[in-house]
């Protein structure tokens, strides 16, 4: 049997409080801290910071 992978699916939620989110994955071994990345929010039509949240 193969070992379980280190990548985990995460959700990037907009800090503009629009409810918009992106889904992606990250390697927990290389990046144990929470991810923050600047991406485009189509609701407000601006680039805003997206923060990591758990996928429910």
From Swiss-Prot:
Molecular functions per Gene Ontology: structural constituent of ribosome
GO BP, sorted A to Z: translation
A family per Pfam: Ribosomal_L33
Ribonucleoprotein is among the record's keywords: yes
Highest rank taxon of the organism: Bacteria
Keyword field: Ribonucleoprotein, Ribosomal protein
One GO cellular component, as annotated: cytosolic large ribosomal subunit
Keyword Lipid metabolism assigned: no
SUPFAM superfamilies cross-referenced by the UniProt entry: Zn-binding ribosomal proteins
UniProt similarity note: Belongs to the bacterial ribosomal protein bL33 family.
HAMAP family linked: Ribosomal_bL33
PANTHER family: 54S RIBOSOMAL PROTEIN L39, MITOCHONDRIAL, LARGE RIBOSOMAL SUBUNIT PROTEIN BL33M
Name recorded for this polypeptide: Large ribosomal subunit protein bL33
Organism: Haemophilus influenzae (strain ATCC 51907 / DSM 11121 / KW20 / Rd)
């Amino acid at each position: 049997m193969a070992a379980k992978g280190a990548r985990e699916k995460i959700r990037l939620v907009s800090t503009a409080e629009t409810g918009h989110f992106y889904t992606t994955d990250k390697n927990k071994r290389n990046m144990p801290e929470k991810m923050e990345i600047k991406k485009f929010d189509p609701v407000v039509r601006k680039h805003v910071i997206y923060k990591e949240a758990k996928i429910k």
